[in-house]
Curated annotation (Swiss-Prot):
Reactions this protein catalyses: RNA(n) + a ribonucleoside 5'-triphosphate = RNA(n+1) + diphosphate
Taxonomy, superkingdom: Bacteria
Protein known as: DNA-directed RNA polymerase subunit beta
Cited PROSITE patterns: RNA_POL_BETA
Keyword Electron transport: no
GO biological process: DNA-templated transcription
Residue ranges with Basic and acidic residues bias: 1108-1117
Annotated source species: Trichormus variabilis (strain ATCC 29413 / PCC 7937) (Anabaena variabilis)
InterPro entries noted in UniProt: DNA-dir_RNA_pol_bsu_ext_1_sf, DNA-dir_RNA_pol_bsu_external_1, DNA-dir_RNA_pol_su2, DNA-dir_RNAP_su2_dom, DNA-dir_RNAP_su2_hyb_sf, RNA_pol_bsu_bac, RNA_pol_bsu_CS, RNA_pol_bsu_protrusion
GO MF annotation terms: DNA binding; DNA-directed RNA polymerase activity; ribonucleoside binding
Protein family per UniProt: Belongs to the RNA polymerase beta chain family.
Region (Disordered): 1094-1117
Enzyme class: transferase
Length: 1117
């Protein structure tokens, strides 16, 4: 038993999106009921009417549309919530019961996503400061240590205690002015004796009392009221109410289950966890701990420790939002109770679902944590669902977050990945859950460890999950320490973590050992082989770039993987997995049917989206295979069956591959032969030189599906029409349209082609004078519509794969004012080309600079050309040596025809084991194939390579290997852009920016300096006027260019006039003057009218260059 375990030290991975699912399940089973019950009963202001929600009996009705249908119709996949409510009239004793509709609740799909208005969205997990009490020490300006304690609730007022240099204890309520701590304690009704009995060092608190003098309870309450409500006459009753509502009213103040747990743990109290408000005992204990700190008893807290930060997942975020909605609902119900007649009231007339619906809609539609799902490939989808963000409501902001929050903390070990985080302003604020981490009932992150007894790892015992707090006082060894077959730790010294420090100890001292070497990193990072040989910065880029890999036409799994590819693909939900044992009875491109055999697991009795399940033997299960769906990122989602008719399948077997998967394993890129060598400067600065084979054989070809949409609206002048009759368009442009004016499926379209013909009625004002004259004379309506068709934008082309028509008659829900919506999907095959971005898994990214014919590529001794040439200088300074190991082991695998799975951190099998295994496999490849050139032990990893153009060998042997390279989603087709004329900004009249706006290239401040430095005055002048915002000048210039005349002299830029107007609007009399020389030789100061260019501009006094003709040139000679 143990020896088997030794061969397989890897611990089984948990379900990777369980964090989303279990959280939403908690919301449905507990969270929602908890909220409904906390608002029940609602009484009116007189107290004679009561409305009770019977929360635990709430019902969800069947969703209106299925997941697929909701996506197609642009609607939300949601269920209706009904709650039984009871209206009690205390005067008459009437009881009315009714089931009341309280709103739509979006449902989570089985893949952990939500479908909101037809788009798949993900709710990101938020990591926030846990409620509880925190102690911190500060050094004041005199160099004396002072301590402070903050009591932070889940919701409600903060309470902060602090000591000062005179040894007095102060308290602040909700960040207001300082108040003596004695006032608060006395106001709570505690006597001096009670206070002193609770303190370990009462003599310290005595100073505060001596300084302030004694307070009675009444005086204390008055003082409290004065401080919190300055300017109002203080009363004892007012003070009492103020205190009660601030800290002891469960509606206003809530520690939450977590807050109570943390408080009890820190202050060693035993208050039951149903008490969610403060007690006087809590406050006393907090003050006691604070005073003890002055005597060096106790410890201060580290805010960034994961024991003090907790995760709020979907369920809790949604619960908070429901609370907001119910708060608004409660107010409305109260008002209606007061206003309406008590006899005719029914629960249904009282409860208005709108506020709750609005709150939920707002959360899913516009919360910072509800994000459009990143669907580029399965890994991106998986990572997005496991993301942890410190931003969002109740979290941090980018500007406020310092370095400490962003930093890697020792408690992140096995909980948050230290590597995967964005580059840029969000670095460290957005992280990713580590592979084995899970969230416990309080929202703290836990990670599993194996127990160790007397230096022997107990593989026979279940792994223990521990939070960061529990793990602090234990000696924990990492997952890659060597053990023998009996589980004994090998070696005299073992590296361990103990109380946030990394140190070494003897094997006997170790308490626990991590379950797996990849436990500390996230899913994306654990897909990088030889991760331990890469610099962390490059591993970060590698993790982030794998998520940007485009799904290719023919996916190919890596020759060198890490063993997590299969689980990653399965949990992303992209592959179809058999739910039972059985026989395949039918397979085609769109469905797979399996006849069940054997016993069904009891849990699968529930029906899910994909095929209905009931546990009868011999029953068939249908699995739908999706074909060529468009993803959120315009990539193509396509599944293809892997099984044949008549095949036996077992539960959990992969039935169909999704995009970017092959054989049920993640396959983001392609294995290609790489040479590390410079080639004519084409791989300078990370550029990449590739072979034409990658283009011809469609190795890096991907399919992209673009969606174009147009709606025919109701306008003031009449409805817009979707039609084939478009004014001023020849029959040639219409040949692909059907009789309705919509493009037919299968048509090839290019930029500027009409996809949907649409005409808009135009009013009188839109017509030129000659048109008006004609209509006045002949009284005929020269067809008064203008062409408003949907055309293919610039730079796009492809084949129409789908057309969808939505009209009111068919019962589709359309946006207000629209009569009809047409959606056209255009697919394009994009081969790899110059300007596309490629990357490996080790952060080695580059842009393709040239595509060489196959015959010109450097070739190997057996005549086979390499596929890609990378710059060797990209390796040493970046310290991502993992790519070299990967490409050499890949070369061995390529030669032997095998694939390798290498778990990261393989040094547990001995020193330099990565190098040993690579050399060993290369040697094996050479011996098995009998080709001596494959591996030369004297110059390991290098091979003599020949120049494809001349056939000469290159000067030196070159590192050759097979690397796994990805094509990233940053494609040149989406970025390349040019503008001749186009739209201008309204105020400044300068061209807009960006490809989407058909914008121009910004000629910024520094570029202006460059031209100034060269004295290129005329070039600069036309850049700042004619080419930008001199309105009249640019029209004249265009006219001149068209007619072949000289370009006239530029006028005044519009932005200068805007500046003038702005200064004038401040009341400054500012004007432009110029000096004119008069006929008699005297000069005169003339004000320039900047609005004069509305009149015809006078031609400038300057030599005009008529366009030179050939004759005049001949004359000169």
């Amino acid at each position: 038993m143990i020896s088997e375990n030794y061969i397989e030290p890897a611990f089984l991975l948990p379900d990777l999106i369980e964090i989303q699912r279990s959280s939403f399940r908690w919301f449905l089973e507990e969270g929602l009921i908890e909220e409904l019950n906390s608002f029940s009963p609602i009484t009116d202001y007189t107290g004679k009417l009561e409305l009770h929600f019977l929360g635990h009996n709430y019902k969800l009705k069947e969703p209106k549309y299925s997941v697929e249908e909701a996506k197609r119709r642009d609607s939300t996949y949601a269920v209706q919530m009904y709650v039984p409510t009871r209206l009690l009239n205390k005067e008459t004793g009437d009881i009315k019961e009714q089931e009341v509709f309280i709103g739509d609740l979006p449902l989570m799909t089985d893949r952990g996503t939500f479908i909101i208005n037809g788009a798949e969205r993900v709710i990101v997990n938020q990591i926030v400061r846990s409620p509880g009490v925190y102690y911190k020490s500060e050094i004041d300006k005199n160099g004396r240590r002072t301590y402070s304690a903050s009591l932070i609730p889940n919701r409600g007022a903060w309470l902060k205690f602090e000591t000062d240099r005179n040894d007095l204890v102060w308290v602040r309520i909700d960040k207001t002015r300082k108040l003596s701590a004695q006032v608060l304690l006395k106001a709570l009704g505690l006597s001096d004796n009670e206070i002193f009995d609770a303190l370990r060092h009462p003599e310290y608190f005595q100073k505060t009392i001596e300084k302030e003098g004694q307070f009675s309870e009444e005086e204390a309450l008055m003082e409290l009221y004065r401080k919190l409500r300055p300017g109002e006459p203080p009363t004892v009753l007012g003070g009492q109410q103020l205190l009660d509502s601030r800290f002891f009213d469960p509606k206003r103040y809530d520690l939450g289950r977590v807050g109570r747990y943390k408080l009890n743990k820190k202050l060693r109290l035993s208050v039951p966890d149903t008490v969610r408000v403060l007690t006087s005992g809590d406050i006393l204990a907090a003050v006691d701990y604070l005073i003890n700190l002055e005597y060096d008893i106790g410890s201060i807290d580290d805010i960034d420790h994961l024991g003090n930060r907790r995760v709020r997942s979907v369920g809790e975020l949604l619960q908070n939002q429901v609370r907001v909605g119910l708060n608004r609902l409660e107010r409305i119900i109260r008002e209606r109770m007061t206003v309406s007649d008590a006899e005719v009231l029914t629960p249904a007339s009282l409860v208005n679902p709108k506020p709750l619906v609005a709150a939920i809609k707002e959360f899913f539609g516009s919360s910072q944590l509800s994000q459009f799902m990143d669907q580029t490939n399965p890994l991106a989808e998986l990572t997005h669902k496991r993301r942890l963000s410190a931003l969002g409501p109740g979290g941090l902001t980018r500007e406020r977050a310092g370095f400490a929050v962003r930093d890697i903390h020792p408690s992140h070990y096995g909980r948050i990945c230290p590597i995967e985080t964005p580059e840029g302003p969000n670095a460290g604020l957005i992280g990713s859950l580590a592979t084995h981490a899970r969230v416990n009932q309080y929202g703290f992150l836990e990670t599993p460890f194996r127990p160790v007894e007397n230096g022997r790892v107990r593989f026979d015992q279940p792994a223990v999950y521990m939070t960061a707090d529990e793990e602090d006082d234990l000696r924990v060894a990492p997952g890659d320490i060597p053990v023998d077959e009996n589980g004994h730790i090998i070696g005299p010294q073992v590296p361990v973590r103990y109380r946030q420090e990394f140190s070494t100890t003897t094997p006997e001292q170790v308490d626990y050992v991590a379950v797996s070497p990849v436990q500390i990193v996230s899913v994306a990072t654990s897909m990088i082989p030889f991760l331990e040989h890469d610099d962390a910065n490059r591993a970060l880029m590698g993790s982030n770039m794998q998520r940007q890999a485009v799904p290719l036409l023919k996916p190919e799994r890596p020759l060198v993987g890490t063993g997590l590819e299969a689980q990653g693909a399965r949990d992303s939900g992209m592959v179809i997995v058999s739910r039972t044992d059985g026989d395949v009875v039918y397979v085609d491109a769109t469905e797979i049917r399996v006849r069940v055999s054997g016993q069904l697991p009891a849990a699968s009795g529930k029906s899910t989206d994909n095929g209905q399940l009931t546990s009868q033997k011999g029953q068939e299960i249908r699995y739908t295979v999706s074909k060529y769906q468009r993803s959120n990122q315009d990539t193509c989602l396509n599944q293809k069956p892997l099984v044949r008719i008549g095949e036996r399948v077992v539960a959990g077997q992969v039935l169909a591959d999704g995009s970017s998967t092959e054989g049920g394993e993640l396959a983001l890129g392609q294995n290609i032969v790489v040479a590390y060598m410079p080639w004519e400067g084409y791989n300078y600065e990370d550029a990449i030189l590739i072979s034409e084979r990658l283009v011809q054989d469609d190795i890096y070809t991907s399919i992209h599906i673009e969606k174009y949409e147009i709606e025919a609206r109701q306008t003031k002048l009449g409805p817009e029409e979707i039609t084939r009759e478009i004014p001023n368009v020849g029959e040639d442009a219409l040949r692909q349209l059907d009789e309705q004016g919509i493009i037919r499926i299968g048509a090839w379209v290019e930029a500027g082609d009409i996809l949907v013909g649409k005409v808009t009625p135009k009013g009188e004002s839109d017509q030129p004078p000659e048109e008006k004259l004609l209509r006045a004379i002949f009284g005929e309506k020269a067809r008064d519509v203008r062409d408003n068709s949907l055309r293919v934008p610039n730079g796009e082309k492809g084949r129409v794969v789908d057309v969808r028509l939505f009209t009111r008659e068919q019962g589709d829900e359309l946006p207000p004012g629209a009569n009809m919506v047409v959606r056209v999907y255009v697919a394009q095959k994009r081969k790899i080309q110059v300007g596309d971005k490629m990357a490996g898994r080790h952060g080695n990214k580059g842009i393709i600079s040239r595509i060489l014919p196959i015959e010109d590529m450097p070739y190997l001794p057996d005549g086979s050309p390499v596929d890609i040439v990378l710059n060797p200088l990209g390796v040493p300074s970046r310290m991502n040596v993992g790519q070299v190991f990967e490409c050499l082991l890949g070369w061995a695998g390529h030669t032997l025809g095998v694939r390798f799975k290498i778990t990261p951190f393989d040094e547990m099998y001995g020193e330099e084991s990565s190098r040993r295994i690579v050399h060993g496999k290369l040697q094996e490849a050479r011996d098995e194939t009998g080709k001596d050139w494959v591996y030369n032990p004297d110059d390991p990893g290098k091979i003599m390579v020949f120049d494809g153009r001349t056939g000469e060998p290159f000067d030196r042997p070159v590192t050759i290997g097979v690397a796994y390279m990805l094509k990233l989603v940053h494609l040149v087709d989406d970025k390349i852009h040019a503008r001749s004329t186009g739209p201008y900004s309204l105020v400044t009249q300068q061209p807009l920016g960006g490809k989407a706006q058909q914008g121009g290239q910004r000629f910024g401040e520094m570029e202006v300096w460059a031209l100034e430095a060269f004295g290129a005055a005329y070039t600069l002048q036309e850049l700042l006027t004619v080419k930008s915002d001199d309105m009249q000048g640019r029209n004249e210039a265009l006219n001149a260019i068209v007619k072949g005349k000289a370009i006239p002299r530029p006028g005044t830029p519009e932005s200068f006039k805007v500046l003038m107007r702005e200064l004038q609007s401040l009341g400054l009399d500012i004007a432009v003057h110029k000096v004119e020389t008069q006929a008699d030789g005297s000069s005169l100061d003339v004000e320039v009218d900047l609005m004069a260019d509305q009149l015809a501009r006078r031609t400038p006094p300057r030599p005009t260059y008529e366009s030179l003709s050939r004759e005049s040139l001949d004359d000169d000679e």
